[in-house]
């Protein structure tokens, strides 16, 4: 019996007869030969039908195929060194499952809005396919890395009673007779998990009501947030470096085909796998920008152009450490050597992509954290449970958060973050 295989496994079946279920992405004919561009969700490759090698019925069926028709094929796999994939199939038989007219996305240039309106279909095309395969590798690498490091997956709630960072960029939800908000971060609940289980990571959707149309912003995005008990900031930076190096290495090892589809130069990513990220102080980053003629002073936060400039000075991610307390959230621990700054760090991705990680050592002292909550103008009652984490068995602890789509955008070298998620939610878009 002929074996049913995926396109991705073609290399294991060279010169063998196999069966596949596929969709048609494009077709061209030169009289007695029909060339079919095929996909099956694992890869794209070419099928060839020669009139002299198949029945009249099969050849006519192939001629009738329309874009995104679905069908079974039987044929023999051969090497094809001209293609990105490296293999093709000589088709001897096919069985049509569905074959309808009117597929809206033709093999021509389409506008961004048109493709977003048809995102449910555009996902089938080569570019989003490659991005989502890389996204999947990054997800698997994340789980593998943290399990090996002794972390457990910990699930934080989506509904929040209050804002984790005291911001106003919140989506309000009516929660029966109470007010609730969609989560901007699972961090505070992650800290509770760390005090129970030592080392945890949360991974899920977060929401931010930012009225921004910038290429690095969405209203719904995914965050990966580890929290680690008994750990100081320097140790946290070591973990961040190892994690990012491991994740990029997994993409390079498992997604060579997808990187080729995207035209992404893997050599631009390779330095990251070596680690050795520079740890640049906020003070030195300000000096670097000032020397470049930028209008910025100590105490200012970095804008996207500032982060972009800094990132272009390095061939791999860089840590910017110890920001002023005035521009970071209340829960961070102050630097014992300089109480005007926090023990915190952002990871800036190279090639102008800016911040992808943010983290800090958390303030572990009950009285100091209570004071910082009050100084931030937050309702102390809302954070009493959070203070309890320090009151009962509080220890030094640290954590960080990774913007998943921002990291994907850098690794895939995307122009806009909306490409990094299957169905982007933007200020002007909630469908499909």
Swiss-Prot record:
EC number: 6.1.1.22
Positions in coiled-coil regions: none
Subcellular location: Cytoplasm
Pfam families referenced in this protein's UniProt entry, alphabetically: tRNA-synt_2, tRNA_anti-codon
Annotated Gene Ontology cellular component terms: cytoplasm
MF term (GO), any: ATP binding
Name of the featured protein: Asparagine--tRNA ligase
GO terms, biological process: asparaginyl-tRNA aminoacylation
Record key words, sorted: Aminoacyl-tRNA synthetase, ATP-binding, Cytoplasm, Ligase, Nucleotide-binding, Protein biosynthesis
Domain of life, source organism: Bacteria
Catalytic activity: tRNA(Asn) + L-asparagine + ATP = L-asparaginyl-tRNA(Asn) + AMP + diphosphate + H(+)
Family membership: Belongs to the class-II aminoacyl-tRNA synthetase family.
Leading EC class: ligase
Assembly and binders: Homodimer.
HAMAP family: Asn_tRNA_synth
Lineage summary: Bacteria, Bacillati, Bacillota, Bacilli, Lactobacillales
Main subcellular location of this protein, as a coarse class: cytoplasm
């Amino acid at each position: 019996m002929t074996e049913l295989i995926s396109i991705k496994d073609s290399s294991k079946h060279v010169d063998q007869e196999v069966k596949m279920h596929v969709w048609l992405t494009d077709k061209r004919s030169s009289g007695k030969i029909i060339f079919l561009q095929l996909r099956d969700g694992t890869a794209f490759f070419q099928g060839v039908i020669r009139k002299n090698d198949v029945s009249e019925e099969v050849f006519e069926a192939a001629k009738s195929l329309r874009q995104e028709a679905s069908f079974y094929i039987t044929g023999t796999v051969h090497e094809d060194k001209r293609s990105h994939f490296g293999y093709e199939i000589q088709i001897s038989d096919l069985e049509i499952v569905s074959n309808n007219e009117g597929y809206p996305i033709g093999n021509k240039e389409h506008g961004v809005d048109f493709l977003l309106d048809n995102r449910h279909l555009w996902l089938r095309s080569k570019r989003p396919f490659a991005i989502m395969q890389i996204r999947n590798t990054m997800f698997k690498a994340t789980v593998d890395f943290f399990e090996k490091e002794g972390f457990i997956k910990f699930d934080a709630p989506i509904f929040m009673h209050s804002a984790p960072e005291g911001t106003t960029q919140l989506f309000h939800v009516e929660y029966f007779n109470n007010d609730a908000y969609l989560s901007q971060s699972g961090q505070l609940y992650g800290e509770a998990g760390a005090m129970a289980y030592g080392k945890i990571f949360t991974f899920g959707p977060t929401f931010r009501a930012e009225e921004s149309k910038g290429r690095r912003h969405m209203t719904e995005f995914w965050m990966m947030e580890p929290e680690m008990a008994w750990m100081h900031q320097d140790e946290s930076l070591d973990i961040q470096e190892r994690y990012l190096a491991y994740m990029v290495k997994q993409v390079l090892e498992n997604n060579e085909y997808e990187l080729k589809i995207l035209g992404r130069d893997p050599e631009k990513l390779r330095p990251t796998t070596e680690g050795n990220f520079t740890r640049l102080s906020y003070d030195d980053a300000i000096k670097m920008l000032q020397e470049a003629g930028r209008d910025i002073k100590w105490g200012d936060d970095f804008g996207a152009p500032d982060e972009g400039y800094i990132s272009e000075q390095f061939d791999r991610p860089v840590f910017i450490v110890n920001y002023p307390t005035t521009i970071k959230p209340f829960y961070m621990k102050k630097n014992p050597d300089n109480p005007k700054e926090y023990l915190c760090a952002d990871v800036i991705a190279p090639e102008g992509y800016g911040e992808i990680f943010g983290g800090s050592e958390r303030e572990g002292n009950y009285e100091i954290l209570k004071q910082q909550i009050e100084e931030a103008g937050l309702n102390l009652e809302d954070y009493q449970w959070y203070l309890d984490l320090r009151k009962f068995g509080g220890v030094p602890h640290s954590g960080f958060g990774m913007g998943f789509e921002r990291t994907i955008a850098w690794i895939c070298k995307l122009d806009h973050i909306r490409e990094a998620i299957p169905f982007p939610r933007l200020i002007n878009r909630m469908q499909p």
